[in-house]
Every structure is written in structure tokens, then in C-alpha cells.
């Protein structure tokens, strides 16, 4: 009788596109595929932690109920190391999810972060789950860095956007990876469904909005993106190139690539679309999944 190989699931970075990971996991479960190891980077660390702790249902219920106004209200402005402090968001997470240690999770789990001063890749395998997720999600310029054990940590997507290597180090013999960087670069588009009544927008955001968050549309020639979109797209380019390089040297056995080209960094209110595309991406890879995983 053939021994069942230990399966790892590597969930990549990708900001709001990361809700596609929920759809990927749901589609894999429907095929009877359940990972033995889960590793994530940035938003992948969040979804991976929810799965590893058995709380994916709670996360899915919360994200599918998000409106753009909810996203705006969770932004707590700071000018120290980033635009958003993140305290409000992660305080909310502590009310939604159980506060656990990584060692207590029923499924082996790890998150990737970057040590800011050295550029070193750090594997977070111990300590509080939400603190590890917060460090892995600390997107430079957007969220403030996290200080952990005397080191300053930022988003793991800078060094390892799709953590196949960590899955294998934790004992995975086969790895299914989800890369969210496919198809995300292209002509600038304004994000969908972002109309918010003035009274619902914090004063600080309303003051920043004209120059920082709103691009300019021209009748002739390409539209000019906002400062925020230029910065975030530049970060996307870096992470995409790093992901291609890492995956060439550390390939997954199955690579799943949700396509969400019109998703902006902060489109967290569009979870239903992302989840549906995550499911569709698994369906596209159905024959290979059957061949590799049996």
C-alpha cells in the first residue's frame, strides 16, 4: 500500500487578493485534499493561521461581510514607520479569533517576516499567532513595523512571497503553492466600489485622499495613478520578481494562480469575488492535482 505523502500548503502574499486563499482551501477540501503543514506570507499568513487553528469559517464570515466603509474605519493613522498602525484591526481580530500560541495549533504552521535592518528572512514558528501574522503583514509604508525579540520586522513578501521552502523544511514532501502575483500588473484602473459618504471618512483620510489615494484620468493617454497606487504597484513588481526567482529555485509540485488583475491593494471589501476566483483557480489545476496527489 502506497504511503500517503505529507502535504504542505504555501499561501503567498498579495494584500486584498489574499482572500482568494479561502476559495482555494475550500476547493481543495471538496476534493478531499487537506494539508498537513500550512505556511503563509503576509495575507497568506493570516488565512493560513485561520485554517491551521480551525477558524477559517469565522474569517470567511467576517471578510464576506466587509464593506469599504468598514475597511476605512479600521485604518488608524500614524506617521511613525507607516501610514496605518494596525492596532485597531488586530484588536478586532482578538475579539473574533481565539488568542493562541503557534505551538498549540492542530496543524503545523509558520509565517514569513523580513528583518528590516539586515534584510534577513525570518521564519516565525513560535510565540503568539496573531503577533506572527501582524509581523508578516507589515507592508512597508502602509503598516508600521513590528518589534519582536529586539528586531524590527516587516512584510515577509519582500524576501519569500510564496513560502514553499518553509513548507518543505517543516516536513512537507509535496507542496501546493498559491501565487497571487499572476496577472496583477497592467494599465492603471480606479478601484471598484470605493464611494464613501464624506461623513463616513475620517478627517485625516479625507485630507489625504485627493493627492495620495485618487489618481487622475485623462481623455487622451494613460491615466495617472495616485501616490499610493504608484508605491503599492512598485512593491507588487518587486514581490512578483522575487516570487518568480524563488519559485524557479524552489518549485512547488502544484502551483495555483488566481487571476485578480483589477484588485487594488486595499480592496478587502471584495472578498466574495476573490474567494470565487480562488475556487476557479483550483478547478483549472484539477487534472494536475489529481495526477500529483492521486
Task: Walk through the language-model features, giving the residues of each.
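Patatin-like phospholipase
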Residues: 1-41, 49-294
